[in-house]
């Protein structure tokens, strides 16, 4: 054990990390627990696409805290780190780096192989940087054996999983309308789009379509005018009422428009802005059912020759029923383009309508006069065309939310394309039931998860990209039959090309392989790659190379992952193993700035974890992030709260330094024999630290990390530093071998060692540093090789409750002193406490006297002047009009007598039964008394002062100032000094006491090394001008 000085947490971090690295501590801990019970954790993989942000840091700190806790419980923790390395996040970054604007550029400018190489290089480079950032936070994970989806064995597991899905008839290829990114030129799954809706300003267009066999018009509303050239149907709700609106124009002409009756006024109000309408009226109202089957003339028939061909097909350009039609806006008639919307697609399929989606992968039209034009660039031109044909009812703008690409942030299109799907709809009910068996933290996430899954459709797993796991599906060019390959060995066996290097099965190498179909035709691989969420969904078993289900005992990610990663891994496990892949799942919130804004470069409010740890050290950030609020709530990052956390840890360090330095001074060697001599306050802190340990273990098991850290903070600040250290400070000044001193040291030693064992998961650096200084030769070399234990025999609930009362009393005395401006250095002659706590006060009254600086404690009811106040609210409920008579009866009894009578229960006066709740007793307190309420009654403090009180207070004033001067002079604890005091005359007894407290000798003359002058003002307004000289005792 060595002397301890002040701490710099950042320097401490570095020192401890160097120690761990030199001693290979992480691996030693792993080896130590190798035969312990297994604890399986799956790391939700971050994308290797840049530096970590505060949310990523929070995520890894949560994981590291839980896993460190499990290690000190003796578990053999499977803790592989994981990385997301495929997909659009990486591709978009590489495209930006090489100024690539399209997939065509990839193939013509640098080539597929070079692009794949650059993606791999980018991912690996950022992996190394991000790993260093995680390690800087003190994170212990198995980074050496981290799972990487770009490795062949992991990719093969994706193939094996997909073959299992195929064998279970859960894999299908189908033409469906879904999300399409025109910038990335690929389809997206619905779970990738959740949370990616942004507010946009789009056209709001009302259009009229002329009915084929009459001069009447149906009206529709759309925010995507560009889809009108692809219109195939119009939907109505058969149950709604539709009005035939006679519209008269200023030029004397008239038309009939068909609009849902409830929306007529809204639509006509808009129509009047763009048309010279003189008046309108409803001529008749019909049910939507009567409109079904009516044919209309496509509004852009002349501009799109393809529509002229479609017009010859039965049911095309026809009004059909649709349950999705509502009256929440629009016209009650819905424009339907089966190539550009899920509802539209399903309606079209139901009525055998061709799926017409005339746009290419870049979102440009392939038919009509707008051929070659990007869809969003068509809007104004389509509107102008409708105006020229007198078919526009109204044109405006509307703000609404619209889905965007989750990586490049481009507005998405709804487009019908052929894709590969996992048929989740067949097993959705099983997924929901399995999800209910998971231990969700917090428990309400279960409802959110189940509700989210209930709305999912089949999973679109194919992506028209490059950097990903290639779909292991080969399709025959002759008969269209397809086969799913489940491993590289199977592919080698079936391959026509035997010389292709398959050590890496990314594109384009795997595309060179052809198979022979049973019909004799050539089979080529479908060019698509798997959804990157499929990659991470494989993690529970692919990360450990197992084809058997191994349920994770703990996973945690941010709240955006509830229907993303939590879902993707569950869905794949359900497909392959018919079960969920995790037992306990914790959701955490997002990190925001101090005002609650999302952090972003544009707002300039991003907080870098590296910058924070450089300023504060990793442990301060770790403790702050886990204690700022409940983990599942969004966290508003605050530097002032970081300062408070640092201050709290500094308080712990100072308490440790105080303890260690005195122990070193007295050559203290820990020995459990000293526990035989513990005092009440020692027994209390021993009980408290084990109670805290118990609470911490319970909280970490859940895990409720806020409960864990709040318990630690409260113990450090209130129990240990502000209470126990104060109680035993005087014992550290006793003779070297005094048993009271030794038992205090033994208690301090035990408490600090136990405390850092509890804190080690959240403050690993600080805990290790203290442990290294305090450990004895027979102890393990690292704190993380110790097991966290709870000594239940130390726990004494009665003692803790009694001490809590004593602390309340002391706090009340301090409040009373503040009220009376009566500083703690001046003794109080007497306090009066209620008799109901006599037993507790008789046992521990000495603590009240020491900590409150009180000379005498009196246990009795305070004898002030008692007055009675009737409780009119309660009396009114019972006695109503008799209340005045009851009040008179109450006032007829002396207050002291009434109070005594009511102690026994109800009391009858003038035929009225008086209950305790009918009255309130108040005590009038004399000027020399201050009363303060606490949970068991009131503390009454006598604030009268006499000469003895003043002298004792002045003694403390002088001691404090000499101690302050010693600190200024940087003197060792035990270093003797000579003191000369002027301005106050003390008796020899008082001078002897001061000398003992400050390690000094009072002398008449000295060669001053340091002089200070003060003016001391006592509570009774006396003033003393003093001068103190100190000479080092050479």
UniProtKB/Swiss-Prot annotation:
It catalyses: tRNA(Ile) + L-isoleucine + ATP = L-isoleucyl-tRNA(Ile) + AMP + diphosphate. Keywords: Aminoacyl-tRNA synthetase, ATP-binding, Cytoplasm, Ligase, Metal-binding, Nucleotide-binding, Protein biosynthesis, Zinc. GO terms for cellular component: cytoplasm. ATP binds at residue 601. One of its GO terms (molecular function) is ATP binding. A motif ('KMSKS' region) lies at residues 598-602. One of its GO terms (biological process) is isoleucyl-tRNA aminoacylation. Its EC number is 6.1.1.5. It is found in: Cytoplasm. Its cofactor is Zn(2+). A motif ('HIGH' region) lies at residues 46-56. The keyword Cell division does not apply. IleRS has two distinct active sites: one for aminoacylation and one for editing. The misactivated valine is translocated from the active site to the editing site, which sterically excludes the correctly activated isoleucine. The single editing site contains two valyl binding pockets, one specific for each substrate (Val-AMP or Val-tRNA(Ile)). Belongs to the class-I aminoacyl-tRNA synthetase family. IleS type 2 subfamily. This is Isoleucine--tRNA ligase. It comes from Methanococcus maripaludis (strain DSM 14266 / JCM 13030 / NBRC 101832 / S2 / LL).
